[in-house]
Amino acid sequence: MSDAVTPCSSAKVPSVQEFITTSSDTQTDRPRPPLSRRRDKPQLSCNACRRRKVRCDRLHPCSNCSSRGHGSSCEYAPTTPTTGTAASTITEKPPLPGPLHGTASNMQNRIDQLESLVLGLMHQHQTGPSSRASPLEEPPPRPITPDQRAASPSVTGSDRILTFAPETQRDVSPTPSDYGSIRIQQTGVSYVSSSHWAAILGSIADLRSHFAQEDEAHSRSASHVQPPTAFPKPQLLYSSLVNETPASIVKSVPPRPVVDRLLSRYFNVLDIAPAYVRQQYEEFWKAPHAAPIMWVGLLFSMMCLSTQLQQALLGLNKPSPTLGHSRRPSQAAESQETVESYKEKAIQCLILGHYTKGGPYVLETLILYFLVECFHLKDMEVGVWMLVGNIVQVAILMGYHRDADHFPNISPFAGEMRRRVWAMIVQLDFSISTQLGLPRLVKESQTDTAEPRNLHDSDFDELTTELPTSRPETEVTPTLYVLAKLRLLSVGVKVADVATEPRPHSYAEVLELDHQINEARSALPSSLKWSGLGSSLNVPSQIIIQRIWLEVIAQQLKIVLHRKFLEPSRLQQHYGSSRSACLTAAMKILQLQRLVDEETQADGLLYQSRWRVSSAFINDFLLATSILCFCLQSHADEQKDTNRTSKDAEAAPVDIEEIRQLLNTSLVIWSRQCASSREARRAVAALRYVLGDSGIRSEPHPSEDVLSAPVPAAAISYFPGFSDLMTEYDLPSLGLEPTIEGTTWPVFTTNLNNNIDHWAGVTGFQQMDLSS
């Protein structure tokens, strides 16, 4: 009943498709000869392929079942004993009561009956005397003594410390949905982890595929179809040999007044201290042809990014009648041609400089090129994730995963810059991998690079022989936000492992990680700790966005950690606090979504920094939406389930009405973005399905252009079709641009090649915070 590919086990649950068969399809209708005369060949094909009379490749699951989306129901006949009495097995599938065709309401009732029947069969398989105890089976919770109850703090909200009786030491074995989901289509194969928002929504919609088929013709709209991009992204991975030479590329650099304006905007708006680059920039104009080709690529990347930023600030990519003026299409086209020209030159410089070998300016140019490719990206390409992989590999090749203190030939200044670059790469890797639902590339066990220090750029330079001690975190420096985010992500990587690893983890590990999330959140610098909008009235909008983003990260980690305890197979009371923590975190994120939406309007506190927001939060907003959709749908199913026992009741009451109100507000926000966002249309489809008649049919917001204008972004969620229900919505290119949220882009000194005169001396951008 799911697209997830799960390991084959001895206790399989028949799928809905296998229930909806006639009695002639079963194998038990044929009379069988006595055991003494029986010489049947062993059945090597799965049951489904045998019924369809097609060749089976005997995999677990087989390719035929996987291609049809029935991987979890791919079953093989049990081995029959050769002597003695045959083992008693259930081979006949109970028929679906009533006719197979009827109204939508009747079909919905039958689906609900099937869900109850399947859960009953699962319980029967797990508790039957002839079957082995399943690792998914949970014994009844042990009673908690008064002493244990008194020792448990009664803290409400997502910051509660979850404390339970000693049974928390047993393993929480992964369920089939914990292994993630694989989608096999003619266009390719895609995988997302179980913690991805699309996989969560897919768990709601798997049994409703027939609704998508009935409404498919009605829901498809040609107005959503957008032409494909001219080039696949990232272009660097698809570029062929370069016909240009370094001399011809340098000759194509615009006149200095043009470049001066571009770099001025780049440094001022993107928060980069230009001191280190300025010296090299002056040297470049003295002898342009003497500059390393990789530095020229760095220059073109900065020029390209500055032009894209101008597009974002002026809104050249989209007309805006609400702003009281019109924009010339020719102006937008000319600006885009300039962007493409600068980007092409940066790619040529990377290729001519043999970027895979590493060296001075390589990582800086690759990182800025990555941002250029993602700046107006409508639909996250998996190639972008592969580009991040290239950046990680080049960094490891150059030894960035090892702390510079191990190597005496690296100066203190260069070593600190390397730490800043590595910190940015770690954040980039975690962000992109998480939003794509894929494993991260950097393994903590293989790195020992220290955190960068909390220092101002003026605290040290290339002549420094010993780094000063880190400033107290009460002082705001360009690296303070990076440090705060790194500490949250240090817990985040552990949470991701527990949530997605196929091996079981004890519930005590879950509780310990929950405690670590609370500690990391409490340890955030006071200047970056979110305590409500009322305490942020006298701080810059950039700081407000940083505070909100750190709070969203902390709540997102709570969701990923506790999400699996929302599943029907884990409804025991001793998991009630996990469910409460997960739902509370999701509700807080949607409250922040509403706040960000309100404050990015023309009269809001975040209006001047709205370009920094873009879709930096999009993946976590979608994750929270999917969690509350799952909760609301599960609550509706529980109301129909008369067999629910008291031990399965929630440990803490859930305010369903508040959840419904949050989802209605979220529906309004997502609906305004449907014209350009595929992910928004998926969210709207799920919300309208779950909310039903209570879903608000919103009208376009008068400030829609403010939210949908292109802005820099670097990592958005992508999943090519998470369930058959979503196929009823035509989902073209994604329109919410991705963002690098709060990463810094320092360029560092590298003394790896002292033969390159002043070009190998200083290569330093200091800070570039693109979303906060």
Swiss-Prot record:
List the disulfide bonds in this chain. Answer: none
GO CC, alphabetical? nucleus
A biological process (GO) annotation for this entry?
Answer: DNA-templated transcription
Give GO terms: molecular function aspect only: DNA binding; DNA-binding transcription factor activity, RNA polymerase II-specific; zinc ion binding
SMART domains found in the cross-reference section: Fungal_trans, GAL4
Region annotation (Disordered) ranges: 1-43, 64-93, 124-179
SUPFAM superfamilies linked: Zn2/Cys6 DNA-binding domain
> Is Cell cycle one of the keywords UniProt gives this record?
no
Q: Which Pfam families match?
A: Fungal_trans, Zn_clus
Entry's transmembrane regions: none
Answer whether the UniProt record assigns the keyword DNA-binding to this protein. yes
Which cellular compartments is it found in? Nucleus
Annotated InterPro entries: Sec_Metabolite_Reg (IPR050613), Transcription_factor_dom_fun (IPR007219), Zn2-C6_fun-type_DNA-bd_sf (IPR036864), Zn2Cys6_DnaBD (IPR001138)
Q: What does this protein do?
A: Transcription factor that regulates the expression of the gene cluster that mediates the biosynthesis of pyrrolocin.
Protein name listed in UniProt: Pyrrolocin cluster transcription factor fsdR
Question: What are the top taxonomic ranks of the organism?
Answer: Eukaryota, Fungi
